[in-house]
Amino acid sequence: LLKLDNKINIIYRNYKEKNDKVEIENIVKFCKKNKRKIFISNHLKIALNHDFNGLYIPAFNKNLNFKNISLKKKFKIIGSAHNLKEIRIKEKQGCEEIFISPLFKIIKKKGFLNISRFNYLCSLTKKNIVALGGINEKNFNQLHSVNSSGFASISWIKKNRPIIK
């Protein structure tokens, strides 16, 4: 993580095990020390109690109880979606930024959006959109054609640890 540009934010996702309080505190402390924003997936109470920068709401979470909660000043809610119906849910959940995926072909999923469908979905919302899914060194230059405020990659960043200037 130290090699990554500090503009790269971290989303802590732990769907399999019970959350370890010490591990969470260490991750938050590490990110704050290195001036990196840290979000936690699906756990609003933990996010607020442990000074996370925000909450990430995955596409499968359709709960609408997030919007009317009083949050600290710079706390940010972000989410992910795969289609227009999920984008509308993320808007109702109060997400400031929405990750739309998959932009390019990925192994885990049968279909993908492609640039024109992705841009069409982006045009249907006023929220900041982040491109996600299948982004790698072969298609990285195609991101110039995408109407998004940024991009996210899991496997490419893990594999290459790019330092973005």
Located regions from the model:
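Active-site regions of enzymes building and remodeling cell-envelope glycoconjugates
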Residues: 7-10, 52-56, 72-77, 94-97, ...
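Histidine-centered beta-alpha loop that forms part of the nucleotide-sugar donor binding/catalytic region
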Residues: 13, 82, 103
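Glycine-rich phosphate-binding active-site loops on the catalytic face of alpha/beta enzymes
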Residues: 55-68, 99-111, 134-165
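Acidic (Asp/Glu)-rich catalytic clusters
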Residues: 1-6, 30, 69-72, 91-92, ...
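Alpha-helix-loop-beta-strand connector modules within alpha/beta enzyme cores
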Residues: 23-40, 67-83, 111-134
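Catalytic cores of alpha/beta
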Residues: 1, 38-57, 82-94, 123-130, ...
